[in-house]
Regions:
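Short, active-site-adjacent cap segments at secondary-structure transitions
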Residues: 1, 113-116, 151-153
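Cap/insert and terminal regions of metallo-dependent hydrolase folds
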Residues: 43-145
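Core dinuclear metal-dependent hydrolase active-site scaffold
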Residues: 1-54, 154-157
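A broadly conserved detector of short glycine/acidic/proline-rich loop/turn motifs that flank catalytic sites
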Residues: 29, 61, 149
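Residues at the C-termini of beta-strands that transition into short coil/loop
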Residues: 12-14, 58, 147-149
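Short, basic/aromatic-enriched C-terminal tail that caps enzymatic domains
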Residues: 141-157
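Cofactor-binding loop segments of dinucleotide-utilizing enzymes, especially the Rossmann-like FAD-
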Residues: 37, 111, 148
């Protein structure tokens, strides 16, 4: 569908909600995506994200913090399950699969208040990129973390 000059392309995601989706928006030869509540990712997700210029990408939890944290066991299993949320590590691996020279902004978002914190998400994703099978290193990517309490800076692509 379109909103003014913006083409909005919803794509199906794996999450325990009714018809969950991510979004890719295109205008003037540029594209941005919102990819949260992923649960898991696969080639279908990669295909929808692979050449975006900016992305809001879920980095919901640190696996160890979730495992030892206050959530009841069934909730921990749901969060870590295929219809839950992406861990910091999986977010970094997904980022490795979609990195390209024209990706100008990666904003990590949807961080769990109980099972993550901004610095840990940032460093874990950066490390996954550095160790990943791609030509980029963590310091070379335009990575930031969205604040839970304040709006982020405006990003131009």
């Amino acid at each position: 569908f379109t909103l003014g000059d913006v083409q909005v392309e919803p794509f199906a995601i794996s999450h325990d909600a009714a018809e969950p989706c991510g979004y890719r928006m295109r205008a003037d030869g540029k594209s941005v995506a919102v990819a949260t509540d992923l649960g898991i990712y696969d080639d279908y997700i990669i295909e929808h994200l692979k050449d975006v210029n900016a992305i809001l990408l879920e980095a919901n939890h640190d696996i160890h913090m979730l495992e030892v944290g206050p959530y009841p066991y069934p909730l921990k299993q749901r969060v870590m399950g295929n219809k839950g949320h992406l861990s910091n590590e999986l977010s970094g691996r997904l980022l490795c699969d979609i990195l390209h020279d024209n990706l100008k902004s990666v904003m990590l978002g949807h961080l769990s208040k109980e099972n993550n914190y901004a610095e840990l998400a940032y460093e874990t994703v950066k490390l996954e990129v550095t160790l990943g099978d791609n030509p980029y290193k963590g310091d070379e990517i335009p990575l930031a973390v969205a604040s839970r309490d304040h709006r982020s800076d405006i990003i131009t692509v």
